[in-house]
Each structure stands twice: as C-alpha cells, then as structure tokens.
Amino acid sequence: MDFTNERRAMIDLLIRRGISDQRVLDAMAQTPRHVFVPAHERSHAYSDQALPIGEGQTISQPYMVALMIEALQLAPTDRVLEIGAGSGYAAAVLSRIVAKVHTIECREALAASAAALLRTLGYDNVTVHVGDGTQGLPDYAPFDAILVSAASPWVPAPLREQLASSGRLVIPVGGRQAQILLRLRRTGDTLRTERLCDVRFVPLIGGHAWTTEHYPER
C-alpha cells in the first residue's frame, strides 16, 4: 500500500498545528511511520493519534513526536539519548536530524524488535540498548539532547547529570493521569526549566521514576 498521500496530509497537519522546524518536518516526511506500527494498525499510521504497539506501550501521536523533537532545538552534530525506544519510530526521526542516537528500552521484546527494524531500514546511526532508562547511559554521556518518551513523577537525577553544557532535556513530568511537558536547558552548572504544554504519556518505569510497585502489571 502506498502511503504517500497520507504522509503528506500528516505533514500538512503538523504545519497547521504550529510545527515550523523544517528539519523536523522533512525527517518525519521521510520516515515511514507505517512500518513502526502493527500490521492491523497501518491504516491509521498517519493519523494524529497514539497507537498500541504491544507490551502495554504506544507509539506517540505524530504531533507530539514533532513537538518534542522541535523543542530539543537540535544541531546536525548532536548526540541524542532517547528514553523509551518503543517501536523505534522517534529514534528513526531523530537519526535523520542528528549525528548519533542512543535509545533505551526496558522491555526486551520491544528493544529487540526496534533494533532489528532500524537495522533493516538502514538507520546505522541508532543504537538500541536494553535497560533502565532512568539510569541513562553514563558510559556514553554527556549528551547534547535527551528525549524522554514516557512520563515521570520528577526529572531523574542521572539524566540531569548526563546532560552536556548547553544541553536540552525534554520530559513529561507529573502524576499518573496527566503531566506537563518540560524543557530543561543546562548553562554551566545551572538548569533552567520551561513548561511547554499539558500531555499524557505512559509511565516511565525505573529506579529513578515510577517503580513496579506503582505499576505491578508492567
């Protein structure tokens, strides 16, 4: 099935909703979202909605992916850490904008699937790691930008510590049902926080966020 028209309509919608960074728009226009969703969801792949991808997780709606990536204010030489690989879609979009993407997924099955798909599609500047995303990747730090694709009750300390000077971190922070999307920017030893918008994400599970005691089914 040819999704050219659907993908073009998605980009038009992003523009109408205020996404203006041409690099983000181009990256999303070039990334085949339909291959990152289950086969039975492909007819909805370019609609502006989150879709289930298994393991109780979702692929974020296109507008939210675009908004968060635009908020990172990326440069071509940036090294980016993504927390919550999911199906690998956001990492694929990021990889078209920056030099290197590291993405962490705590669910082994999702991580394996994302890694295989990204490798098959030729996203050679993306590395998928299995582990606790709230710990970050200290062996690869610092990062110019960190994108957290799941909601935390607070900003995990290891992620703050792994942010480079002048680095940006975008993360949903709040309770179980609703959160605020925050952007943190490091200047020397100072972190400045901006509130971007209200959001609702699946929970970030890990030692520095929600634990399995809060979400035992996960």
Curated annotation (Swiss-Prot):
Subcellular location: Cytoplasm
A GO MF term: protein-L-isoaspartate (D-aspartate) O-methyltransferase activity
Record field: transmembrane: none
Main location class: cytoplasm
GO annotation, cellular component aspect: cytoplasm
Known catalytic reactions: [protein]-L-isoaspartate + S-adenosyl-L-methionine = [protein]-L-isoaspartate alpha-methyl ester + S-adenosyl-L-homocysteine
InterPro entries: PCMT, SAM-dependent_MTases_sf
Family annotation (PROSITE patterns): PCMT
Active site per UniProt: 60
Sorted UniProt keywords: Cytoplasm, Methyltransferase, S-adenosyl-L-methionine, Transferase
The keyword Phosphoprotein is annotated on this UniProt entry: no
Keyword ATP-binding: no
Broad enzyme group: transferase
Gene Ontology BP terms: methylation; protein modification process; protein repair
EC number in record: 2.1.1.77
Xref: HAMAP family: PIMT (MF_00090)
Family per similarity comment: Belongs to the methyltransferase superfamily. L-isoaspartyl/D-aspartyl protein methyltransferase family.
Function: Catalyzes the methyl esterification of L-isoaspartyl residues in peptides and proteins that result from spontaneous decomposition of normal L-aspartyl and L-asparaginyl residues. It plays a role in the repair and/or degradation of damaged proteins.
Record's protein name: Protein-L-isoaspartate O-methyltransferase
Lineage of the organism: Bacteria, Bacillati, Chloroflexota, Chloroflexia, Chloroflexales
Gene it is expressed from: pcm
